[in-house]
């Protein structure tokens, strides 16, 4: 079995960051001891060097060798994507990890909040998914509107083309964030999973801080919503098609 922890929207070092909640998240993730940790952006609030340094400290305290991290729109503010590269490496990356391949892309654009993947990446994405592994695609912006988030905005301008590409590549799982509301959509045989904010106070209505735990167990897929203290709610439990 492979376990993936999916965190998003940390917003480190800002007035929105809740350090006590972050401590509980770190502790509960380390108790799970996942095989892979995916962080889908907005590590910072304004993309500044001190914020990235604080975000790096938080993420480094998670005990996992395999981490896939992509930037969000807040991380690209003030040309912060350069600091992202300094602290976390490439903004677009492919990670083949023992039966699971995770492809992470930067869907942000400097100076604006709208999402965009871009045609220049499509061939690389398709090439990265030429595998029989379980396929995971990670980005910050939501590809499908999320309920209970108000007026729809900032969905990637090329989301339709990206979804068609992912379907053609037989991608199993899409992980994203941005809207701070957890949700799961099923699109044909692909699950699109949004994470809430892991440890900021930027929550909507009756939602709370949380993250996702995904278990891939041969033909089975289980998705849990996890609260900072470690309490788990099973959201998806199904047998994937062979």
Question: Where does each model-flagged region fall?
Answer:
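Conserved beta-sheet core of the metallophosphoesterase superfamily
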Residues: 151-220
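Active-site environment of divalent metal-dependent phosphoester hydrolases
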Residues: 13-16, 45-50, 73-81, 110-113, ...
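A short C-terminal boundary segment appended to hydrolase-like catalytic domains
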Residues: 217-242
């Amino acid at each position: 079995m492979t376990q993936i922890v999916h965190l998003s929207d940390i917003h480190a070092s800002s007035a929105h960051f809740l350090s006590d909640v972050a401590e509980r998240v770190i502790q509960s993730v380390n108790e799970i001891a996942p095989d892979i940790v995916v962080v889908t952006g907005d590590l910072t609030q304004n993309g500044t060097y001190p914020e990235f340094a604080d975000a790096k400290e938080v993420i480094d305290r998670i005990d996992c060798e395999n981490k896939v991290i992509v930037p969000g729109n807040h991380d690209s503010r003030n040309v912060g994507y350069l600091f992202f590269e300094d602290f976390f490496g490439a903004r677009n990356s492919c990670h083949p990890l023992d039966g699971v391949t995770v492809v992470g892309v930067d869907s942000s654009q400097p100076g604006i909040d709208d999402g965009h993947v871009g045609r220049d990446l499509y061939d690389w994405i398709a090439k990265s998914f030429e595998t029989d592994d379980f396929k995971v695609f990670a980005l910050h912006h939501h590809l499908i509107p999320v309920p209970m988030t108000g007026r729809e905005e900032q969905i990637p301008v090329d989301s339709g083309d990206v979804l068609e590409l992912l379907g053609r590549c037989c991608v199993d799982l899409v992980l994203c964030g941005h809207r701070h509301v957890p949700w799961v959509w099923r699109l044909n045989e692909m699950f699109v999973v949004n994470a809430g904010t892991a440890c900021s106070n930027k929550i909507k209505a009756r939602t709370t801080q949380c993250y996702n735990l995904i278990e891939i167990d041969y033909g089975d897929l289980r998705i849990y919503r996890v609260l900072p203290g470690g309490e788990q709610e099973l959201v998806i439990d199904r047998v994937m098609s062979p």
